[in-house]
């Protein structure tokens, strides 16, 4: 099933400079040095297939810096882990948190619908990004929808592959970039905005603290 899906869009992605890696990731390195990744996630459970298409913007250089600060946060004595966690679990959690190079990820494609398009209309023409089926015969226009996913992904990559977008739309990468270019006022504004809605405010405050210490 995975090969059937990737074969259907291989030519379109190849024309845009992408190569297929590990059988499920279409990737290309842009002029900025960042990597654009389109992933076909498909699994089979109890006889039916589950498909989820995702997009990722990767920057190993940027995230190495971000993850170095994050590791300081996760090892800070002020950062609290559940009391029941053994040291091995803490270490494995830290390793997992500081090893990924993803700056931004798209998992819900509904945000890509046209400005004047209703959610119902979008779902009617493009719902394959998250779909369960027994066979592709249940999705008569699956090839056309996959082609649409290529078009939408290229538009998304164009929009997110800038420092300005990252600073305005991400969390730790944004703070790291703003700090790196000494944009103090913008850094504080972004930090306050993120802190107000942070699911883990303690972690956000510690990241800001260690970021400032690194700058000093």
Residue spans for each PLM region:
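Intrinsically disordered, low-complexity regulatory regions enriched in serine/threonine/proline
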Residues: 1-6, 27-216
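Amphipathic alpha-helical segments
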Residues: 1-21
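A short acidic/basic microdomain associated with nuclease active sites
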Residues: 17-31
């Amino acid at each position: 099933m995975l090969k059937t899906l990737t074969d259907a869009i291989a030519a379109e992605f190849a024309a845009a400079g992408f190569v297929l890696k590990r059988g499920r990731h279409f990737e290309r390195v842009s002029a900025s040095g960042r990597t654009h990744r389109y992933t076909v996630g498909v699994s089979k459970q109890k006889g039916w297939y589950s498909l989820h298409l995702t997009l990722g913007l990767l920057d190993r250089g940027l995230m190495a810096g971000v993850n170095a600060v994050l590791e300081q946060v996760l090892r800070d004595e002020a950062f609290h882990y559940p009391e029941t966690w053994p040291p091995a679990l803490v270490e494995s959690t830290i390793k997992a948190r500081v090893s990924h190079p993803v700056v931004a990820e798209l998992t819900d494609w509904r945000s890509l619908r046209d400005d004047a398009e209703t959610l119902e209309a979008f779902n009617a023409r493009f719902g394959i990004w998250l779909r369960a089926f027994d066979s592709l015969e249940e999705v008569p226009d699956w090839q056309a929808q996959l082609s649409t996913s290529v078009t939408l992904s290229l538009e998304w990559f164009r929009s997110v592959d800038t420092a300005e977008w990252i600073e305005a739309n991400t969390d730790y990468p944004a703070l790291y970039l703003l700090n790196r270019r000494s944009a103090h006022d913008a850094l504080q504004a972004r930090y306050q905005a993120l802190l107000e809605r942070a699911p883990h405010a303690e972690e956000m405050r510690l990241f800001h603290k260690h970021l400032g210490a690194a700058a000093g």
